[in-house]
């Protein structure tokens, strides 16, 4: 599961768990981005975001955290994340999971055509969200029917943008994210400067889920 995780919250965790259950995936790998290339705001230091992700996922033996994007350096592109994860798990079938609203702009991603050769795409959304992606569907004409699918996740009413805003204004973060992450945000005094609005964020993430036995 790749993304900024700034901060990670229950929406990310529930989305990963639900998709893993639906597609019978063996492992969920969370991949905090190094330097997100499409973010229009300053993100927290990569080490802070990495440690929050480790804290949030520690209690689930099915979850793990990878540093491939952080250690690579430079802007983080999904095509590179997929390439590196495939190199580490050559026998795994990869699932790339992202917010459904991000799929509308997927053709602006660097090397997006090759990404569909490396992974199946799953868009996660809040209940009732309708994805208008005719141009994406047309571009994918000729690929397998399951190359792209949608999954509704009720917990996506939670967003990283709102969590940052609440922290900036001293509002509680309890029950929006694991207790350890709440304590980390407080100890490190993260998000004390009011954040940019960030638009209508639903899930500040893209997701990579290797299914080692599903080849």
From Swiss-Prot:
Keywords: ATP-binding, NAD, Nucleotide-binding, Nucleotidyltransferase, Pyridine nucleotide biosynthesis, Transferase. GO terms for molecular function: ATP binding; nicotinate-nucleotide adenylyltransferase activity. It catalyses: nicotinate beta-D-ribonucleotide + ATP + H(+) = deamido-NAD(+) + diphosphate. Its EC number is 2.7.7.18. One of its GO terms (biological process) is NAD biosynthetic process. CDD domains: NMNAT. Pathway: Cofactor biosynthesis; NAD(+) biosynthesis; deamido-NAD(+) from nicotinate D-ribonucleotide: step 1/1. Residues 203-215 have a biased composition (Polar residues). SUPFAM superfamilies: Nucleotidylyl transferase. The keyword Disulfide bond does not apply. It comes from the Bacteria. Residues 193-215 are annotated as: Disordered. Catalyzes the reversible adenylation of nicotinate mononucleotide (NaMN) to nicotinic acid adenine dinucleotide (NaAD). Belongs to the NadD family. HAMAP family: NaMN_adenylyltr. This is Probable nicotinate-nucleotide adenylyltransferase. It comes from Mycobacterium marinum (strain ATCC BAA-535 / M). The lineage of its organism: Bacteria, Bacillati, Actinomycetota, Actinomycetes, Mycobacteriales. The gene is nadD.
């Amino acid at each position: 599961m790749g993304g900024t995780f700034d901060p990670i919250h229950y929406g990310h965790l529930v989305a990963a768990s639900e998709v893993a259950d639906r597609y019978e995936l063996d492992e969920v790998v969370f991949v905090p981005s190094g330097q997100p290339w499409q973010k229009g705001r300053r993100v927290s230091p990569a080490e802070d975001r990495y440690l929050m992700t480790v804290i949030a996922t520690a209690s689930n033996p099915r979850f793990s955290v990878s540093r491939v994007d952080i250690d690579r350096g430079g802007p983080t592109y999904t095509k590179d994340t997929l390439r590196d994860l495939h190199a580490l798990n050559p026998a795994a079938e990869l699932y790339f999971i992202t917010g459904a609203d991000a799929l509308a702009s997927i053709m602006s991603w660097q090397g997006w055509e090759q990404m569909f050769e490396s992974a199946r795409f799953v868009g996660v959304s809040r209940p009732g969200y309708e994805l208008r992606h005719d141009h994406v569907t047309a571009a994918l004409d000729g690929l397998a029917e399951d190359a792209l699918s949608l999954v509704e996740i009720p917990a996506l009413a939670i967003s990283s943008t709102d969590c940052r805003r609440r922290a900036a204004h001293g509002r509680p973060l309890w029950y929006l994210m694991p207790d350890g992450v709440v304590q980390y945000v407080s100890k490190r005094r993260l998000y004390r400067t009011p954040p940019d609005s960030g638009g209508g964020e639903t899930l500040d993430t893209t997701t990579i889920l290797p299914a080692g036995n599903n080849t």
